[in-house]
Amino acid sequence: MRVFDFDGTIYDGESLFDLYLYSARHDPKVFRYIAPVLRYAVKYKLGRATLEQMEYGVGKMTEGYLAELSRSKRVASVEQLVDDFWDRNYSRIKPWYQPESDDVILTASFGLTVGEACRRLGVRNLVASEVDVGTMKVTYLNFSTNKAKRFRELYGPDAVVDEFYTDSKFDQPMIDMARHAFMVKGNTITQVK
């Protein structure tokens, strides 16, 4: 099986950040959630935030953001906003990525957002951060070591990862698990294992 990180790997950018910007065009009130989430994201990328800090900080900010959107009179629904976002941004899926039936997308982004991209790609296997759409509460953040842990919970301890693709050294637990691993920068793919 092939396993892919999503943001920066097969998607050119950070989809959650891009969705924030897209949604702010529809309801500028959500701008107040962008700076705190960016701060946590930068700390995480630099290795300066613990998983617990990410879970608390990003979880709380995301809950506020999603609740604000779901109450907004300018947005039909969060699901419709996500669908419209992918109508506009689906072309940012990198051209080298050709989906296969058993591919797994393993991402820190939310299933609520990346799930629509996976549906359009024909990818059925998504391991992502989770939100209860009824309450808009974050129920699971798929960051850092949680990625490998969650992958093993869902696919079992004996699941064989033939190839793993990422843009981040923070995915080292998945790199270690894979038979072959690749680092992606732009459209350049370099085998690292």
Across the structure, where does each feature detected by a protein language model lie?
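Short, mixed-charge, low-aromatic patches
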Residues: 12-16, 35-38, 47-54, 69-74, ...
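Short, functional N-terminal and low-complexity linear motifs
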Residues: 2-9, 24-25, 60-65, 81-85, ...
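Active-site neighborhood of HAD-like aspartate-dependent phosphohydrolases
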Residues: 1-49
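A general boundary/transition motif marking the beginning of the first structured unit of a protein
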Residues: 7, 46-49, 66-70, 85, ...
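Metal-dependent phosphoesterase signature
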Residues: 54-92
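A structural signal for alpha-helix termini and helix-coil/disorder junctions
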Residues: 25-26, 44, 48, 64, ...
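C-terminal cap/substrate-recognition subdomain and adjoining C-terminal extension
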Residues: 80-193
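Short, compositionally biased "basic patch" segments
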Residues: 40-68, 118-121, 125-126
